[in-house]
Amino acid sequence: MAKHRYLPMTEQDEKEMLDVIGVKSIDDLFQDIPEKIRFKRDYDLKPAKSEPALLRELSKLASKNANTTEYASFLGAGVYSHYIPTVVDHVISRSEFYTAYTPYQPEISQGELQAIFEFQTMIAELTGMDLANSSMYDGGTALAEAAMLASGHTKRKKILISGAVHPESSNVLKTYATGQHIEVEVIPELDGKTDIEALKKALSDDIAGFVVQYPNFYGQVEPLAELEKLVHENNSLLLVSSNPLSLGLLTPPGEFGADIVVGDSQVFGIPESFGGPHCGFFAVTNKLMRKVPGRLVGETVDENGKRGYVLTLQAREQHIRRDKATSNICSNQALNALASSVAMATLGKTGLVEMAKQNLDKSHYAKQKFREKGFEVLFSDGFFNEFVVKLSKPIKEVNESLLDEGIIGGYDLGFYEEKYKHHMLVAVTEMRTKEEIDAFVASLEGAK
């Protein structure tokens, strides 16, 4: 019987464990480490704080961050400030969801399975595709997995990706491709969109697929109909990375004939959280159903004829046959997928369209204000909620100045492209007011 039942790692615990493994002391466990490199001094740690004192100190540190509750944010580039209905946190905090893991036992996991099924259904409907999986880690890894699928399906070892795809997603793809010995070629961007002529020249018999973003990194809406025709005439797959909120207004990629549609559902119910964790989605046509990575939940009936939900087509997955799995993704983002599901269900179809329309209207209002003030605004008016403004000063310097005025500025495009030095990618969501937009434009007057 343990002497100290509720106190872990007592001397008694240590002795019992050492006895079991036949070692006399803890030092004996580390005998392989040379004496001269062992740390033998006392740890120079400050005295422990009480809980109230610790909370005060952590709150003080946290207050140094510029958060989107107190600051007007015009920063996007893949992570956006959107309204999150209060019901989202209430639902995902329920213990049945919050502590749930992969629902391998359907007879005791119907609630979780149905929640995942609803997420799949809504994503499939938004993207115009036949089916969607239960989630991926984020938009970038979903894009990379899509390229791996395309290569495996076509038995080709080269992927083309538009230069107007988010650079970070492009880098994730290149990382994945290295291990699979897949070549990645970037098709240059021209005037904020994919260079069509360059794509025509690059298409060949060894191309597995072409990756395009819709709307793209610069906010522009790519001509999917034209791209689809070129790609499919080459017997390659069309892979589209999309902002799901924009699909409340834009024609879904599936209606243009996309083979795979991926993206990140952060725009629905998931906070920015310094860049993650978020929630990727992955939608395909029926012909690719058995090659989809990750979990798939299907609807069925039990022996009594009652509707039920189960994990289906599991032979694709690594927990069944690791060496033959379509992907080695295991745990997914089910909790964040639930958050997105609750947010979408709360909005409803009408609310989602209204939210998308507010993004469109407010961003176009902001662009017009910049033009009225004499700023150079790049590219066409065919954008959703992001556009590019050219300034006369370094964006880093401008953004530091904006912070002093309670504004989080846009993304510094010069970080990735030298030709876009002093160019700011501005995102305007439904959260921004007319007064905030006007103040933002006025604050940039000195950098015109």
Swiss-Prot record:
Annotated EC: 1.4.4.2
Enzyme class, first EC level, given as a word: oxidoreductase
Reactions catalysed: N(6)-[(R)-lipoyl]-L-lysyl-[glycine-cleavage complex H protein] + glycine + H(+) = N(6)-[(R)-S(8)-aminomethyldihydrolipoyl]-L-lysyl-[glycine-cleavage complex H protein] + CO2
Cited InterPro entries: GcvPA, GDC-P_N, GDC_P, PyrdxlP-dep_Trfase, PyrdxlP-dep_Trfase_major, PyrdxlP-dep_Trfase_small
Molecular-function GO terms, alphabetical: glycine dehydrogenase (decarboxylating) activity
Pfam families in alphabetical order: GDC-P
UniProt KW keywords: Oxidoreductase
GO biological process: glycine decarboxylation via glycine cleavage system; nucleoside metabolic process
Keyword Metal-binding: no
Signal peptide per UniProt: none
Keyword Oxidoreductase included in the entry's annotation: yes
Family: Belongs to the GcvP family. N-terminal subunit subfamily.
Assembly notes: The glycine cleavage system is composed of four proteins: P, T, L and H. In this organism, the P 'protein' is a heterodimer of two subunits.
Function: The glycine cleavage system catalyzes the degradation of glycine. The P protein binds the alpha-amino group of glycine through its pyridoxal phosphate cofactor; CO(2) is released and the remaining methylamine moiety is then transferred to the lipoamide cofactor of the H protein.
The protein's name in its UniProt record: Probable glycine dehydrogenase (decarboxylating) subunit 1
Native species: Listeria monocytogenes serotype 4a (strain HCC23)
Lineage: Bacteria, Bacillati, Bacillota, Bacilli, Bacillales
